[in-house]
Amino acid sequence: MEKYIMSLDQGTTSSRCIIFNKKGEVVSVAQKEFTQIYPKAGWVEHDPLEIWGKQAGVAGEALNIARISPEQIAGIGITNQRETTVVWNKRTGMPVYNAIVWQCRRTAGYCDELREKGLDKTIKEKTGLMLDAYFSATKIKWILDNVEGARELAEKGDLLFGNIDTWLIWNMTKGKIHVTDYTNASRTMLFNIHELKWDEELLEILDIPKSMLPEVKPSSCVYGETDEILFGVSIPISGDAGDQQAALFGQTCFNAGMAKNTYGTGCFLLMNTGEKAVDSKNGLLTTIAVGIDGKVEYALEGSIFIGGAVIQWLRDELRMVKTAQETEKYATEVEDNNGVYLVPAFVGIGAPYWDSYARGTILGLTRGAKKEHIIRAALESMAYQTHDVLKAMEEDSGIELKALKVDGGACQNNFLMQFQSDILGVEVDRPEVVETTALGAAYLAGLAVGYWKDRNEISQNWAISRSFAPAMEDEKKEKLIKGWHKAVTKAMDWEERE
């Protein structure tokens, strides 16, 4: 009987299930979108019960599509939107409030209060993270302080906290197991990434009872088995990682200096730094890449707020293109950008500049500038921003980038990938299987149950669909980068400070 690995990929807008075979190929995919809840400006919530219902539903659907039985699943891997916070009553299994999503800014004011007390330095030293409303800690505190009766229940030991991975595992095991992995724990702003434990001092500062927190385990191990009510048989749950870390693993970035960029709405860059937690001087996050083989490995992470979103803007607001795919055709119809730069600082600019007062600009316009030049400049902006983050990573880590592995929607744009390679001066590799997030969770699960022997075997599965090699002269490259940096300085400090 042929065996497979099931991957549950619980994202920000949809719940998916992908089944993989031994070669790391996709056998079937099932997907369901779920409701986004916006109670106030800047607030974002999800319904944890809807997420669980949809996730269980797509698991059954993926089995049906693949025409395989639950007995053929050797293990289940979970990957999830990170930081999103669920608090539930362990006696009833019911959430006390909606899940507060990573994008939610409701605790920004409280973060400012902590910053005024000088706690940002303590938090960065212990957790590797910036003090920000993005992470789970202040979201948990908000629920305890604002939901009637929540604090009393928590003090009595009746409330549990979990990110989405923990919530799914708890439900899959019918409340038997309350667990998370090192990668998800490292995004809570409560976990000491050097001592590998929940930090007592941070829990005290935020007034969060330790009894709420899950046990932290490696990303690849058998956490428990699914309750028989789910599939009719018990299946080992054996892999767990946050989405960006899972993508790094799925891209087989197993050695220090290997990096991946996910070109989505924004871009997420992660570089493996091995067993060394590198402290960033350039506003990057230090995070846990994976917990496996009795040790943890670390990564530097940089996020670019506006990546593929600039293409959506060209399509929906400026109506310059009908589809995102058309941008490649227009960009290649002109020889160069004609001196035009587009800085997509629509919501400020992230790593390594960190200026929330920057705003979007188009610079270098002349009478000869055409629509094609603006479209090309928009695509080029993704490559320039990636260049800036990767240079910061190299500087922080002292590790030279060897090649960049890519995934996400915009990695299908050949013009962008070639330009990315030219600007970085390194090879850019696009894999055959672009479902790298789900694949990473599958690999973690499969390793724990012996479905794959070791990381070497997995590395052999990784196949290049297309490789892009740098072909631009250094002088031209330097001139373009210089122009980009000049454009960024013009975009900065634009919005009036209150």
UniProtKB/Swiss-Prot annotation:
Pathway: Polyol metabolism; glycerol degradation via glycerol kinase pathway; sn-glycerol 3-phosphate from glycerol: step 1/1. Sn-glycerol 3-phosphate binds at T12, R82, E83, Y134, D243. GO terms for biological process: glycerol catabolic process; glycerol metabolic process; glycerol-3-phosphate metabolic process. It is an enzyme of class 2 (transferase). The keyword Flavoprotein does not apply. It catalyses: glycerol + ATP = sn-glycerol 3-phosphate + ADP + H(+). Key enzyme in the regulation of glycerol uptake and metabolism. Catalyzes the phosphorylation of glycerol to yield sn-glycerol 3-phosphate. This is Glycerol kinase.
